[in-house]
Swiss-Prot record:
Keywords from the UniProt entry: Carbohydrate metabolism, Isomerase, Metal-binding
Described purpose of this protein according to its UniProt entry: Catalyzes the reversible epimerization of D-ribulose 5-phosphate to D-xylulose 5-phosphate.
Family, as annotated: Belongs to the ribulose-phosphate 3-epimerase family.
GO terms for MF: D-ribulose-phosphate 3-epimerase activity; metal ion binding
The enzyme's E.C. designation: 5.1.3.1
Cofactor, free-text remark: Binds 1 divalent metal cation per subunit.
Xref: Pfam families: Ribul_P_3_epim (PF00834)
Enzyme class: isomerase
NCBIfam families: PRK05581.1-4 (NF004076), rpe (TIGR01163)
Superkingdom assignment: Bacteria
Family annotation (InterPro entries): Aldolase_TIM, Ribul_P_3_epim, Ribul_P_3_epim-like, RibuloseP-bd_barrel
Protein name: Ribulose-phosphate 3-epimerase
Gene name of this polypeptide: rpe
PROSITE patterns attached to this UniProt entry: RIBUL_P_3_EPIMER_1, RIBUL_P_3_EPIMER_2
Length: 224
């Protein structure tokens, strides 16, 4: 498997979301940040907009729910047709139950952790998930600087995967660009969320291809 690139529409033009999805049709996933103004201070889009995007684009939808009460709100995104639905470990006392409901509704289940959240308390439940999303910025706003300290979490999980102890995709979100993607790939990331590095480029499609090449060139596990 090669590196997966997931452009984040948080950096796109919200007045032209259908067009903005189309210009990154070569991407592996389309990363959609859902924020409720409670779990994080920002407010973005919700289920109706995601449903419209799903109807307009064939790119697998990677929904990142930065919201309270994912127990209630996560399954409807799976039911709508999202490929992967990620909620935050910090937002629920029943992450395994939420993952089960997401999978039952037809999507892959992801669990996300903020930069300051220790990963160790969640290692035992990772077999219930398809994706681990490691935040490399504080969730809520795009354009922040990459926090390299989170790569220790990536390395921990990569060792487990390489040892055959776990099957999961490692995704990273925040501050990913042409330089930081190499650090993340070397640490063991599989999927890279990129906002400004894609939508801030003159040619977003070419930016996706360039990021994919850079990650694949330096990653031992992605070159296998």
């Amino acid at each position: 498997m090669g590196p997966l690139i997931a452009p984040s529409i948080l950096a796109a033009d919200f007045a032209r979301l259908t067009d903005e999805a189309a210009v990154v049709a070569s991407a592996d996933w389309l990363h959609v940040d859902v924020m409720d103004g409670h779990f994080v201070p920002n407010l973005t889009i919700g289920l109706p907009v995601v449903q419209s995007l799903l109807a307009a684009s064939d790119i697998p939808m990677d929904c990142h729910l930065m919201i309270d009460n994912p127990d209630r709100w996560a399954p409807p995104y799976a039911e709508a047709g999202a490929y992967n639905v990620t909620f935050h470990a910090e937002a629920t006392d029943n992450p395994v139950g939420v993952a089960h409901d997401i999978r039952t509704a037809g999507a892959k289940a992801g669990i996300g952790v903020k930069p300051g959240t220790p990963l160790n308390p969640y290692l035992d439940i990772l077999p219930h998930f398809d994706t681990l999303l490691i935040m490399s910025v504080e969730p809520g706003f795009g354009g922040q600087a990459f926090i390299p300290e989170v790569l220790s979490k990536v390395r921990t999980v990569r060792k487990m995967v390489d040892a055959g102890e776990l099957t999961i995709l490692v995704e990273i979100d925040g501050g990913i660009n042409a330089d930081t993607i190499e650090q993340a790939a070397e640490a063991g990331v599989d999927c890279f969320v990129a906002g400004s590095a894609v939508y801030g480029a003159a040619d977003p499609s070419a930016a996706v291809a360039a990021l994919r090449r850079r990650a694949g060139a330096v990653s031992p596990h992605l070159r296998r």
